[in-house]
């Protein structure tokens, strides 16, 4: 079986796909899916999904995916799973960036990072053998784990709170008010790289 070394971003995307975080997306997107999601925020089957989920590969490594049933994924020198490639393609990055972010200039961190991705994209299902601990992963619950917690606690009404900022007193006030009205509160911090100043 061919293998490829993947980045931390790719590793986290593999985990999110495999554990169902990106539901209803179950595999790295093909060209039609990426274009439809970027232009209309829906999958070809008309289910809503806001952002392309892609697996990028360099020109040097793309040969590892050609005529392969599956390709081993290596992260931090350990095999973490495999990808079953279904399609290899090149997309129009400027067009995708314009559709997703509203412009295609490199002064936006998301656009800049997207432009830094490799030339080729591979679609296909991923299987992850085991999560490698990365700082916060012990607090990262899969959708199925969250559903079990909700069942165990017998919550009937649940509200979500999503933030990209460090929690402060205003957040605490809002969360306490929400818990007066709802059985449970799920906090979803958006964690990622920040723009360098």
Where are these regions (language model features)?
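Nucleotidyltransferase catalytic core that binds NTPs
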Residues: 1-197
């Amino acid at each position: 079986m061919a293998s490829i070394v993947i980045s931390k971003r790719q590793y986290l995307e593999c985990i999110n796909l495999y554990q169902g975080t990106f539901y209803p997306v179950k595999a790295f997107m093909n060209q039609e899916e990426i274009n439809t999601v970027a232009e209309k925020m829906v999958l070809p089957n008309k289910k809503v999904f806001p952002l392309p989920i892609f697996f990028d590969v360099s020109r040097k490594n793309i040969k590892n995916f050609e005529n392969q049933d599956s390709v081993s994924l290596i992260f931090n020198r350990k095999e973490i799973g495999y990808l079953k490639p279904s399609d290899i393609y090149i997309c129009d990055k400027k067009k995708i960036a314009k559709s997703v972010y509203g412009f295609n200039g490199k002064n936006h961190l998301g656009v800049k990072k997207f432009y830094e991705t490799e030339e080729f994209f591979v679609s296909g299902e991923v299987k992850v053998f085991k999560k490698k601990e990365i700082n916060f992963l012990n607090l990262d619950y899969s959708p199925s784990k969250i559903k079990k917690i909700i069942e165990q606690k017998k919550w009937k009404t649940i509200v979500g709170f999503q933030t990209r900022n460090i929690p402060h007193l205003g957040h605490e006030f809002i969360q306490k008010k929400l818990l007066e009205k709802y059985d449970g509160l799920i906090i979803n911090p958006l964690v990622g790289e920040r723009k360098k100043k």
